[in-house]
Amino acid sequence: MSSDKSIQREESASFNEHSLSYIRQAAEYGLYEIRGMGAKRRVPSFDDLIFLSASASRYPLEGYREKCESKTVLGTRYAKQPIELGIPITIAGMSFGSLSANVKEALGQAATQMGTSTTTGDGGMTPEERESSKTLVYQCLPSRYGFNPNDLRKADAIEMVLGQGAKPGGGGMLLGQKVSPRVAQMRTLPEGIDQRSACRHPDWTGPDDLKIKIEELREITDWKIPVYVKMGATRVREDVKLAVKAGADVVVIDGMQGGTAATQQVFIEHTGIPTLAALPLAV
């Protein structure tokens, strides 16, 4: 029987309007979507945790007169000068380029006021960031953009980056509109051109080279400061074992909800696992 009413088609869970729009765009232009930030899908986060407070078996503290210790020490395994933080929360790496010099300086000031550390990110260290940060972690990434041994010696810790939660196994991207004259000079790149970062370190042939690179970084800094190893949360149990065996002081696990300046949409939404799922595998 025919009906005057138009047939209402329900949206498919697999091929909703957003997915169809993405497919049409890729078919028309032959390009995949590039965007920043983190996954839009709902994933378990630290906000989902529920704490067990004190009652009878655990005696409660009077917060206004009894202190709760939040000090965190990182790098006691091998470093001569471990990092001591006032809180167990740090600011992750965000590059100068994806962020302005003013923002990087502000992050350093905020971290200092809160008694914690901030991290350089891809593209190197700016003088403003070093001056404003009491505790600064210097990243060594596959791109080696802006990598400077002199700046390395100014850092309070080094973070060897193997991957990122928003794009594990994939390289980075800095859109040309953010490649200013200063960014181009620091990275030795042409101004205003989209730049891609490598997905793996150019002087490595396998996992065994991680140990060699960590030893090189320790020799450059006279074994004074901690060496972190950062990785995207994928094969967590195996990756953490390799990092520990290679001699890392600290292993950083970056879950899929971590943000990025720019990468493929499919990487952000469909690779890696959340931080909460990764932590039990890491320990």
Model-derived segments and their meaning:
Residues 201-283:
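Glycine-rich phosphate/ribose-binding loops and adjacent secondary-structure elements
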Residues 158-163, 182-188, 252-256:
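Non-cysteine beta-strand/loop elements that form the S-adenosyl-L-methionine
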Residues 4-17, 22-30, 44-46, 101, ...:
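Internal alpha/beta core interface subdomains
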Residues 98, 166-168, 189-197, 201, ...:
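Conserved radical SAM core fold
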Residues 1-89, 93-117, 124-125, 129-133, ...:
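Conserved, well-structured core domains of diverse proteins
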Residues 129, 135-137, 176-183, 260-275:
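C-terminal helical cap(s) of enzyme catalytic domains, especially alpha/beta-barrels
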